[in-house]
């Protein structure tokens, strides 16, 4: 069985407390408010269990209460927010059951995707992935963990897009939203970011060899690391998890 590093004393990543500007998102005002709140929750800028104060959010974003309330309702439907009558609105704590289910769905989709892509990947697609890995390495060297996290996600998104199935990413985003948030917890663990880059390089090597089985094996190893690292964090940070 894979063993994580012994040090789990580091605090989970907490991003900048400010919400991202609405101008960074497209769509209606309501959708923009939803997106910036969603990103704040996924990035752990809003900590699990933290109360969401709508007046403060309205003031920071410069919007009325209506789009904020609508956004909170959407987030509650996704399981990212808990609305407790007469008590308040809170960022949902992590649920290991939901994370395990999301990890199962993620593996089912991404293993099939990587195997399919390895059979037909083009040189242009390989160049795009190499470029992404180069930036990942640079961000790791700079100690930019949030930036690395973003490029990590973009690499997986590229691989899914290379399947040619246009609906796959939307399905993926919905199916493992809790996994995406949980990944933020494991990146600060000593050595985890460097190990992630090494795993990405192994995936890349299998794709360059156009070896579907090797690509599948490398992706499986990479994906299964999450729970290996996350379970000890549940013990060391119980306040972030549902009992």
Identify the meaning behind each predicted range.
Residues 1-119, 124-125, 161, 216, ...:
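Short linear motifs at protein or domain termini
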Residues 28, 126-127, 191-194:
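Short helix-capping and inter-helix turn/linker motifs at the boundaries of alpha-helical repeat units
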Residues 41, 117, 140, 207-210:
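Hydrophobic residues in alpha-helical segments
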Residues 63, 191, 210:
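Residue-level signal for the nucleotide or nucleotide-sugar donor/cofactor binding architecture
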Residues 86, 109, 131, 195-198:
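Alpha-helix N-cap/N′ positions at the starts of helices
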Residues 102, 123-184, 198-206, 214-225:
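Conserved amphipathic alpha-helical segments that form helical-bundle/coiled-coil interaction surfaces
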Residues 167, 179-183, 187-190, 227-234, ...:
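Short amphipathic alpha-helical interaction/hinge segments
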Residues 189, 212-218, 238:
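Hydrophobic/aromatic-rich alpha-helical bundle segments in the mid-to-C-terminal region
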């Amino acid at each position: 069985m894979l063993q994580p590093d012994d040090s789990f004393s580091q605090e989970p990543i907490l991003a900048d407390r400010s919400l991202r500007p609405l101008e960074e998102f497209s769509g209606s005002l309501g959708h923009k408010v939803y997106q910036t709140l969603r990103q704040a929750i996924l990035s752990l800028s809003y900590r699990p269990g933290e109360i969401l104060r709508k007046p403060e959010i309205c003031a920071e974003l410069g919007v009325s209460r209506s789009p904020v309330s609508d956004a909170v309702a959407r987030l509650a439907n996704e399981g990212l927010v808990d609305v407790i009558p007469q008590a308040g609105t809170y960022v949902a704590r992590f649920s290991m059951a939901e994370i395990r289910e999301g990890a199962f769905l993620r593996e089912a989709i991404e293993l099939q995707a990587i195997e399919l892509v390895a059979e037909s990947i083009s040189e242009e697609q390989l160049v795009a992935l190499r470029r992404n890995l180069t930036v990942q390495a640079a961000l790791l060297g700079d100690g930019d963990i949030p930036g690395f996290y973003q490029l990590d996600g973009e690499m997986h998104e590229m691989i899914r897009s290379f399947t040619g199935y246009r609906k796959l990413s939307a399905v993926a985003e919905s199916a493992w939203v809790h996994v995406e948030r949980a990944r933020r917890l494991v990146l600060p663990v000593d050595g985890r970011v460097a190990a992630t880059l090494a795993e990405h390089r192994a995936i890349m090597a299998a794709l360059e060899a156009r070896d579907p089985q090797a690509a599948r094996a490398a992706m499986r190893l990479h994906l299964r690391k999450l729970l290996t690292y996350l379970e000890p964090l549940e013990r060391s940070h119980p306040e972030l998890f549902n009992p």
